[in-house]
């Protein structure tokens, strides 16, 4: 049976105050960045034997209650829950990434947080603020759970990373690589079926002059194709 991963893009498009300062790309909603990272994680893991769900509204129109996110996670019987966020602080020099587990979390929660924290900093090139504990309600689900903060929306240095596609890709790769390692995920096995009773041929061109046919044959062979021949039809 495949493992179950639940991803959670924090907040929603209309959540008050959850946005970047007005930087070089303007003001960007936190949820849009969180959603981008979640989608990139899903894309990275598409070839792995894992079932993935989201607890947030994937249109961003509604900020789902934390209690509802927990309920959904539990209903999915998740093995792993990861909430994706970006940080903010009144001190505009605050920088770096950090990963939270619940204050009453398990050893597995700590193991996962300690695994993701340095990887997230390494991939994004931002300061590692470490793994921490907090009483975040969304982390009270039954699954092993962490909340990731991928850089400060209120700091120019971090803003220039987290608002880019490459920065969000780095965030996603860090989390995805840790998920693969933590859950011991394997790539899906693809079984090819072969019908030995049928043979398929590819025909490339028809010509009135044999010289033109010979020229095309030579071009195909030069390109690395084998089994090329000229069939003469009367």
Report each predicted region and the residues it spans.
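Catalytic-core regions of hydrolytic enzymes
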Residues: 1-111, 169
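Active-site-adjacent mobile loop/cap segments within catalytic or ligand-binding domains
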Residues: 3-6, 14-17, 76, 80-90, ...
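Solvent-exposed beta-strand motifs enriched in subsets of small alpha/beta binding domains
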Residues: 8, 189-234
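Extracytoplasmic/secreted envelope proteins and their assembly/folding machinery
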Residues: 35-38, 42, 67-70, 97, ...
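Sec-exported extracytoplasmic/periplasmic mature domains
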Residues: 39-50, 74-78, 117-125, 176, ...
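A structural preference for short, hydrophobic beta-strand core positions in alpha/beta folds
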Residues: 54, 130-133, 229-232
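Residues embedded in well-ordered beta-strands
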Residues: 98, 145-147, 201
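Active-site-adjacent substrate-binding region
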Residues: 108-132
